[in-house]
From Swiss-Prot:
Keyword terms: Nucleus, Ribosome biogenesis, rRNA processing
Protein family per UniProt: Belongs to the pescadillo family.
Source species: Malassezia globosa (strain ATCC MYA-4612 / CBS 7966)
InterPro entries according to UniProt: BRCT_dom, BRCT_dom_sf, PES
Domain of life: Eukaryota
Binding partners and assembly: Component of the NOP7 complex, composed of ERB1, NOP7 and YTM1. The complex is held together by ERB1, which interacts with NOP7 via its N-terminal domain and with YTM1 via a high-affinity interaction between the seven-bladed beta-propeller domains of the 2 proteins. The NOP7 complex associates with the 66S pre-ribosome.
Function per UniProt: Component of the NOP7 complex, which is required for maturation of the 25S and 5.8S ribosomal RNAs and formation of the 60S ribosome.
Bias kind Basic residues: ranges: 612-624
Example of a GO cellular component annotation carried by this entry: PeBoW complex
Protein name (database record): Pescadillo homolog
Annotated region described as Disordered, given as residue ranges: 284-352, 508-580, 612-684
GO molecular function annotations of the record: ribonucleoprotein complex binding; RNA binding
Length: 684
């Protein structure tokens, strides 16, 4: 006879554990448990049957997987928390006894822990760590710009700023930056590293106000994890580029505000590979050559990967030959003895390259003219021919003091501008190699009014606003500078992270400028209204011409009075947007505020009357459109009948999809109405 199953020993009751039970099992406080879960990546779970998981109770509870909590029991950081708890007791006891020397010794020997094993567990491969780098970079840049406070020491801010500078130095070195967008929240950057798109947000360099409702203990735990992760990633990236990590910091230049100039890239020689850690400083030309010289000979000549493969093949052949012949130490050539001079090495490289080249042989079913496969060598050649990384290489820039120098120096150098071709005002920091009166300057970046400012400098320089640099990067070409001159109204700054073609395909709103760039049909939202206005004007002109052709003076006087009255009437875009979309959320409130500011109570009463009439006509149009289109009603009826055949889950999903589509259409109509109102106000 089978054993009777007891309640609560299997199923959801066994697979899930509450948070209070987890605290008792681990014997730690709630704050330590939260910290441990953040570091290990464990988060609450929602069981399908809460009552079964909670053993019959319906009280609101937080659940975790039982296996996750058992996994935490063997965590070394958990033991470090317990050691720190014992350490705190000893320090408090020494302070209570006024044993200051003992308390100082205890504080100097406080228990420490490392997160290296957690990084290796959470990110088994390097690509996994790159995929999770977005939040890490955004958090580091955030803390690098936050002023130090009671809960955050100045050393933490300095460490975050150092990691951010090292990351930006790598991006500038490899020219992997691809997109930049200036938004209200900050500046969005995107770089492609090892085939992975990494996007991060950099706040503007304003004085940050620390919010009081943010739990900095949780934020500091995330920051601790991200600092360790960033150290691992940067070490791997610098090592792949044959650079020594961390780069050497010149403290004197750093104290003078030199920025990236205070970090010096060091190339790793052959002695580094053998463990002698010989370093040599290098300039930009040497940095460009360093990654290709990752393996060198003893005499300093370059040893390519093909040379290593060729020598391994020779050693393998000699070993096979030695199995059948008597052993002879002199017959085994050494690696250094087989190396020829530089000229013969180049010829051997060409031969080896030809031997290693992939040759596509025609199969029996396909002819010789079939398409060849794309190889890694072809992809590398295509990547090397991309002109975008060297977009600004032929120009010399000067950054004015009101422009954020660190941000635009990073953008310019990431797209080919040499450090010797980027200068800034001495107020922004030391290290500028271009003076304000340098004749070589081709682009002077300004972001302030130019009234009363002298713009006469030697040479042929162009004064531009900062948006020109970002728009050139997103357009992947050098744009004309006339629309970006100081004092000019800037063109729309479109986001490069939005696929406008896909948005247009799904029926979303696409700006007119984006449509022109994509070559789509110009969907001008003000065209219909303009045609109606023109027709009305033509009818009025015909009526006037038919009723009183002889009284031309009176007609001209009436037209002049109408023009003057129209000129005196203030523009009210919020009212026009409300009348175009009377059901739009927030439009009524904006129109009321606008009416109070322009005309007071009379304008407010007039607004409410117009809104009521517009709302009534809108409902009437909606009602007539449903009654006057039998084809649409038949389609709706067929849709409802098909909807009854769906399951409950599918029906809910279909309803949510319809609601999302309706919201998208409403948003598109609202934006089109806003665009229509703005275009009318711009008319002379």
């Amino acid at each position: 006879m089978a054993r009777i199953k007891k309640r609560g020993e299997s199923g959801a009751a066994k697979n899930y554990i509450t948070r209070n039970q987890s605290l008792k099992k681990l014997q730690i406080t709630l704050a330590e448990f939260r910290r441990l879960c953040i570091l290990k990546g464990i988060f609450p779970r929602q069981p399908r049957h809460v009552k079964r998981a909670n053993k019959g109770s319906t009280a609101p509870t937080t659940f975790y997987y039982t296996k996750d909590i058992a996994y935490l029991q063997h965590e070394p950081v958990l033991q470090a928390f317990r050691d720190h708890k014992a350490f705190a007791k000893k320090v408090n006891r020494a302070i209570a006894r006024r044993e200051w020397h003992a308390a100082k010794n205890l504080d100097e020997n406080r228990p420490k822990y490392r997160l290296d094993h957690i990084i290796k567990e959470r990110y088994p491969t390097f690509v996994d760590s790159l995929r999770d780098l977005d939040d890490a970079l955004s958090t580091l840049f955030l803390f690098a710009n936050i002023p130090s406070q009671k809960s955050m020491a100045p050393e933490i801010t300095a460490h975050c700023a150092r990691l951010c500078a090292e990351w930006q130095l790598y991006v500038m070195r490899t020219h992997c930056l691809s997109k930049v967008f200036l938004s209200i929240k900050g500046i969005y950057f995107q770089a492609v590293v090892h085939g992975q798109e990494i996007t991060w947000l950099v706040p503007y360099m304003f004085t940050q106000t620390i919010p009081t409702d943010v739990d900095f203990r949780v934020m500091m735990t995330f920051l601790e994890l991200y600092q360790t992760l960033m150290g691992f990633v940067l070490f791997k990236l610098y090592t792949d580029e044959n650079l020594v990590y961390p780069p050497k910091l010149d403290e004197s230049l750093d104290n003078q505000g030199a920025g990236f100039g205070s970090l010096m890239l060091m190339a790793a020689d052959a002695d580094v590979l053998t463990g002698k850690h010989s370093l040599r400083p290098m300039d930009d030309a040497a940095a460009a050559e360093a990654s290709s010289n990752a393996i060198t000979r003893k005499d300093g000549k370059k040893l390519s990967t093909r040379d290593v493969k060729r020598q391994i093949a020779q050693l393998t052949r000699s070993e096979d030959k030695a199995e059948h012949e008597p052993e002879d130490d002199e017959s085994m050539p050494a690696l250094d003895a087989t190396m020829q001079d530089q000229d013969s090495d180049e010829e051997a490289d060409d031969e080896a390259g030809a031997a290693d080249a992939f040759v596509a042989h025609a199969s029996k079913t396909q002819g010789a003219g079939a398409d060849q496969l794309t190889t890694l060598r072809d992809l590398q050649k295509q990547a090397g021919e991309d002109p975008l990384p060297m977009l600004f290489s032929r120009y010399v820039f000067y950054i004015s003091r009101e422009v954020p120098r660190t941000v635009f120096e990073f953008i310019l150098r990431s797209f080919g501008a040499s450090p010797s071709n980027v200068g800034w005002d001495p107020v922004a920091g030391a290290g500028s190699q271009v003076a304000v009166d340098d004749e070589r300057v081709t682009h002077h970046i300004l972001d302030r009014p130019v009234d009363g400012m002298s713009l006469d400098h030697a040479g042929h320089r162009v004064y531009i606003q900062p948006q020109w640099v970002v728009d050139c990067v997103n357009a992947r070409q050098i744009l004309p500078t006339d629309p970006y001159r100081p004092g000019q109204t800037l063109p729309p700054h479109l986001s490069p992270f939005v696929d406008d073609r896909e948005v247009a395909r799904k029926g979303g709103y696409v700006p007119e400028e984006a449509r022109e760039k994509l070559g789509l049909e110009a969907e001008y939202v003000g065209g219909a209204d303009e045609d109606e206005d023109e027709d009305e004007d033509e009818d009025e002109d015909e009526d006037k011409a038919g009723s009183g052709r002889g009284d031309d003076k009176n007609v001209a006087a009436r037209e002049q009075d109408a023009v003057e009255k129209h000129d005196k009437t203030p523009a009210r875009p919020a009212l026009e947007a409300l009348l175009a979309d009377p059901t739009g959320a927030g439009l009524l409130e904006a129109a009321e505020l606008e009416a109070e500011a322009t005309g007071g109570e009379d304008a407010l009463l007039d607004l409410r009357a117009k809104h009521a009439a517009s709302l009534k006509s809108h409902k009437k149009k909606k009602r007539t459109s449903t009654t006057q289109s039998p084809q649409l009603s038949e389609e709706a009826e067929a849709r409802d009948m098909a909807k009854t055949l769906l399951s409950n889950k599918q029906r809910k999903l279909y309803t949510r999809m319809g609601q999302a589509t309706g919201k998208k259409k409403e948003e598109k109509m609202r934006l089109e109405a806003k665009k229509r109102a703005l275009s009318k106000n711009k008319k002379p």
